[in-house]
Amino acid sequence: MKVRENWIDWAKSIGIMLVIMGHYGMGDKIYGTFIYAFHMPLFFIVSGYLFTPPPQDNSYKQFVLKNVRSLIVPYFIFGIFSVLASAALNFFSGGDYSVSFFMKSFAGLVLGVGYDTEYTVMNNMPLWFLPAMFFVRVISGFLSRYKSRVKIAVCAAGLIIVVLLHRYGLFLPFSAGSALLALPFFYAGAVAKRYGLLENFRNGEMLRLVALFAVSAFVLYLSVYFNTGITDINSCKYNNMLLMFTGGISGTSAVFCVCIAFDGIRSKFITAVSDGTLMIMSLHVYGITVVWNFYKMIAGIAGPGGMDAFVSLPAAVVTAMMITAGLYYPIVFCRKRLPLLLGKAGKKPVGKGKTSLPG
């Protein structure tokens, strides 16, 4: 039976808050550049760390179907909700809710990339993460029976494909290109788990942990400083690929140090947020819209320049906390009644007199 690691819950919770902060109009700010350097790599690294390969005697088809239920089914559920929610928002704000809007939106949902194209619209861009993670897990599950050199060769071939796609302005459907770019991060997490790279820091002195944090933060700074502009796995924007991987891994390492320091602090809220990262990932853009309109209302009362205070790092932190707190009870409900919406495939809803271990 798997033992739940509390520091991983902290890592996922901090990671999802960084995602919200990054999407809160922080892309053109210096701290937004730092957040984008590692907030999505963190999730792929954590997933690799937690990954359990399918047993050799188990059907690979069953492994794929399990990941379809835990990632692709929620993708379409939240995707359809996003189309309807966006149409409703457009209706009340005077935007487009025509037949053409619906056709482009559903086409974008089927295409499965986290951005608009000439013929498609993606109403909820963070949803790209779900099909990308699906491909990463399916590829990793297939390669689990092969030796490391085969995995390295596949990662290298995938990165060559990404470079060619980027050079010629092409993309693969269902965020497969993003999956190829994220695959090395996934394997970095798997390697850290396999060789116990974090154990010395988890069981060692605090001074050693502080030293690792300082080195990781410094390497992250250098990576961002020398890698011009934002990196984005969604759009396969990497600028300098070596610096992208260096920044993603070092930034994640710094977060891990903080989370290992918090390992002794247990919280039902953090556990719930960790369980609900898929839901938060899928719905936070609408939370940002609600909070942003609330800020605009306050700014209108404050007068000219009233919005300046809300376009800042503290406002982004507060917004992330508000959205995660606002989704706490929906997550608790879904954990008991609708685990599919949390990506918990194969887990039965909890009835009276029953308990369920979060996983």
Q: PLM ranges: what are they?
A:
Residues M1-G359:
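Alpha-helical transmembrane segments and their immediate juxtamembrane cytosolic regions
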